[in-house]
Amino acid sequence: MSGGLDILQLKEEDVVKFLAAGVHLGANNCDFQMEDYVYKRKSDGVNIINVKKTWEKLLLAARIIVTIENPADVCVISARPYGQRAILKYASHTGATPIAGRFTPGTFTNQIQAAFREPRLLIVCDPRIDHQPVTEASYVNIPVIAFCNTDSPLRHVDVAIPCNNKGIHSIGLMFWLLAREVLRMRGSISRALPWEIMPDLYFYRDPEEAEKEEQAALARQQEEANAGTTAGFSEWGGAAPWGADPMATAGIAPTIPAPFAATTPAVSADWDSVAPGATDDWGAEPAAPSSDWGTAVTMQEQAKPSTDWA
C-alpha cells in the first residue's frame, strides 16, 4: 500500500529491526489463508514471513486507523501478557482505548452491563487467543485488524498483518511501528526525523526482573551515599583494626590517674603480742561489772520476791 512513493517504502533500518526482533519467524504450521504471506519454509519446519508484505499491511492498517475521527473509538485488545504493555503504550501515544487482560464477554453486545462499549475499530494481538472480541465484533459489524502468525485463523478478520505474534520483542516492535506510522500520517511527528520513543518501551518486562533492577539501583545509591560520607575520613590513616586502642591509633598518649591510696589501719606482724590488760587464761573469772551504772545486784537478790507492794 505504499503506492510507489519513496517516502512510504520500507527502509533498511526498519528491516534490521524486523530481523533483530524476529518478526519474520513464523510457526511450524501454516493456515491455507496465510500461505500468500509465507516467503519460504526452513529445513527445521519454521515458516519465514515475507517482511515486505508485513510492511504493506502495516501501512494499510495505519491508513484505516487514521480515518477514525475520534482516536478513542479505536479499541486495542490483548489477553496475552506479552502484548499488554505494548497496547498500553500504543494507547497512550495514539489515544486509543486499551483492554488489557481478560475480555468480559458481552462488552460489545450486551448493553445492560457497565463495561458496554461501541468502538468503530478493533485491533487484536492474536485472533486465536482473542477469539471472543473478534466474534462479538462480527455481530455488530466492527472492522477487525489482527496481528496474525502463519497458523492463525482469519475468520472474521478484515485486515491481517503477518508477523510473529508470539515473540516478546516482535509484538512490541509491531505496535511501535504501527503507532509511529499512525502519528506520521496524522502529522503529529515528522518523517524526516526519527521518533524519539524507543521500541524498548513497548517490550514486555517481567515484574520480578523489574523489581530486581529497582533493588539493585537502590543498593547502588546506598553504596554511593555511604562512600560519600566516609570519604572525608581517609586522612586519618585508614580504618583501625578491631580491638586496637582508639587513643593509640590517633597518636594521643593515654593519661591514667594515680591509684587512690586507701587509709587502712596498720596491722602488726607479731601475732604473739597481747594487748595491754588482756589475758590468755580462759579459766579466769570474768571481770566485775562497772559500778558506774548503779549498785551491783547479785543473782540471789534478783530472784528474791519483793514484799513491798506499797
UniProtKB/Swiss-Prot annotation:
One annotated GO molecular function: structural constituent of ribosome
Keywords (A to Z) from UniProt: Cytoplasm, Ribonucleoprotein, Ribosomal protein
GO CC terms in record: cytosolic small ribosomal subunit
One annotated GO biological process: ribosomal small subunit assembly
Annotated SUPFAM superfamilies: Ribosomal protein S2
Record-linked Pfam families: 40S_SA_C, Ribosomal_S2
InterPro entries membership: Ribosomal_uS2 (IPR001865), Ribosomal_uS2_C (IPR032281), Ribosomal_uS2_CS (IPR018130), Ribosomal_uS2_euk (IPR027498), Ribosomal_uS2_euk/arc (IPR005707), Ribosomal_uS2_flav_dom_sf (IPR023591)
Region feature Disordered, mapped onto this chain: 213-240, 271-310
Biased composition (Low complexity): 216-227
Gene3D superfamilies from the UniProt entry: Glucose-6-phosphate isomerase like protein, domain 1
Biased composition regions of type Polar residues, renumbered to the chain: 297-310
Cellular compartment(s): Cytoplasm
Family listed: Belongs to the universal ribosomal protein uS2 family.
Known role: Required for the assembly and/or stability of the 40S ribosomal subunit. Required for the processing of the 20S rRNA-precursor to mature 18S rRNA in a late step of the maturation of 40S ribosomal subunits.
Quaternary data: Component of the small ribosomal subunit. Mature ribosomes consist of a small (40S) and a large (60S) subunit. The 40S subunit contains about 33 different proteins and 1 molecule of RNA (18S). The 60S subunit contains about 49 different proteins and 3 molecules of RNA (28S, 5.8S and 5S). Interacts with ribosomal protein S21.
Identification of the protein by name: Small ribosomal subunit protein uS2
Source organism per UniProt: Nematostella vectensis
